[in-house]
């Protein structure tokens, strides 16, 4: 073989090696971009979802599965738009609102309502984790709350090491809950045909179903994670905006499909185990835990409790992060994360100390949250429809139409709730 041939072969090998390294690095960068949607998605399977989904399934069987499905599809679009706003503009939703609201009073109103929503969310999530510890380990609710407090502070410490370790931990907890509900469906044996019918047949046959639908919407489309998700894209990993958006679509799809599966599985389990066994008034998490054992076995109860712990711990951490983003975005001020953690825990300890019904608090908090959805979605749609802000990445007309439909549904449910609750 001539020297020229040898040199040519050597160059080809070098080029192939460089190409392989380049492809590996590109794949690695794309994998590094995955994760923000998993942080957002954990908010969609918080203990508030457990409470509303269990009550829906036990009271009405599979009838409200279509609400869960459509709420999850709406959430998928909204979370992508939130991510897109942050990626394209480099600013989160709260920062854009601060820049565009007419005066400081409007900014103050938006900041206060967003903080209230974050605290109300954290109340449900924190209490849910505490209840999980109480049920699984047979300790008092206050002891469960103290364990929850310590555990969440420890998880938040990871945030000091950067966003990626936190994404891994929260993503792992999301996957744990999903795996648990695969097992729960195995124990429950839901009726497949009835599930499909419930998913595909929109209907309300009872006024309480509309109340629960608002609760499901409030538990599924979470205002605080709309603010948070738009703030999780500070690192571009050297990729173009188009590449980041493409990767984010995949990230949102996977994370929200997992969250949607969990919500559907909770309703299906409650329908199969409670509704069709004559236990049609299981509205409390504690009752659900106790009732599972004689109906489907101790293992199902323990798994239910563990999923509640994983859900509560991860979602209360996300709630704390969202509160921090809201404060920084609206008033350009922040407090140490651990200080915020202790402030937002206080209402939970008060509720527990007063002996209030925890499930009532969980369900009511989700209904209250539904009133904050429109206040987050409407400006999100306005900003992502703006050519001045988004350029070539502004929403197309179909996304805009879908956004209008979502806002109309939210406002209609809110109006119904106002009439119902004040009647």
UniProtKB/Swiss-Prot annotation:
A GO MF label: metal ion binding
Residue ranges crossing the lipid bilayer per the database entry: 31-51, 58-78, 116-136, 137-157, 168-188, 213-233, 254-274, 302-322, 342-362, 363-383, 401-421
Annotated membrane topology: Multi-pass membrane protein
GO cellular component terms, semicolon-separated: plasma membrane
Annotated function: H(+)-stimulated, divalent metal cation uptake system.
Similarity comment: Belongs to the NRAMP family.
NCBIfam families named among the record's database cross-references: nramp, Nramp_1, PRK00701.1
Record's protein name: Divalent metal cation transporter MntH
Gene: mntH
């Amino acid at each position: 073989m001539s020297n020229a041939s040898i040199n040519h072969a050597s160059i080809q090998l070098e080029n192939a090696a460089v190409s392989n390294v380049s492809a590996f690095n590109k794949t690695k960068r794309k994998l590094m971009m995955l994760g923000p949607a998993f942080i957002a998605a954990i908010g969609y399977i918080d203990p508030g979802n457990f409470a509303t989904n269990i009550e829906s399934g036990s009271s009405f069987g599979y009838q409200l599965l279509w609400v869960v499905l459509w709420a999850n599809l709406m959430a998928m679009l909204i979370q992508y738009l939130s991510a897109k706003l942050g990626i394209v503009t480099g600013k989160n939703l709260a920062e854009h609102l601060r820049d565009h609201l007419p005066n400081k009073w409007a900014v103050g109103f938006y900041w206060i309502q967003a903080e209230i929503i974050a605290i109300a969310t954290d109340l449900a999530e924190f209490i849910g984790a505490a209840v999980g510890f109480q049920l699984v380990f047979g300790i008092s609710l206050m002891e469960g709350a103290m364990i929850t407090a310590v555990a969440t502070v420890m998880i938040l410490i990871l945030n000091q090491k950067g966003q990626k370790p936190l994404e891994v931990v929260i993503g792992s907890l999301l996957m744990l809950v999903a795996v648990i509900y695969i097992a729960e469906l195995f124990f429950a044996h839901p009726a497949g045909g009835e599930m499909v019918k419930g998913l595909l047949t929109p209907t309300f046959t009872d006024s309480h179903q509309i109340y629960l639908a608002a609760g499901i919407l409030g538990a599924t489309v979470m205002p605080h994670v709309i603010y948070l998700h738009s703030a999780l894209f500070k690192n571009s990993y050297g990729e173009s905006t188009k590449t980041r958006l493409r990767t984010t679509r995949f990230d949102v799809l996977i994370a929200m499909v997992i969250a949607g599966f969990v919500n559907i599985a909770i309703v299906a389990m409650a329908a199969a185990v409670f509704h069709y066994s004559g236990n049609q008034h299981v509205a409390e998490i504690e009752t659900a835990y106790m009732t599972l054992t004689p109906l489907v076995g101790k293992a199902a109860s323990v798994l239910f409790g563990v999923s509640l712990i994983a859900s509560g711990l991860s979602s209360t951490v996300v709630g704390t992060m969202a509160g921090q983003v809201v404060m920084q975005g609206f008033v350009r001020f922040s407090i140490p994360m651990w200080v915020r953690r202790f402030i937002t825990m206080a209402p939970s300890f008060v509720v527990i100390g007063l002996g209030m019904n925890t499930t009532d608090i969980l369900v009511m908090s989700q209904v209250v949250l539904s009133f904050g959805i429109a206040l987050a979605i409407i400006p999100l749609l306005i900003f992502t429809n703006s050519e001045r802000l988004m350029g070539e990445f502004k929403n197309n007309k179909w996304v805009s139409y879908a956004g209008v439909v979502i806002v109309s549904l939210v406002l209609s449910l809110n109006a119904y709730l106002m009439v119902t609750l004040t009647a």
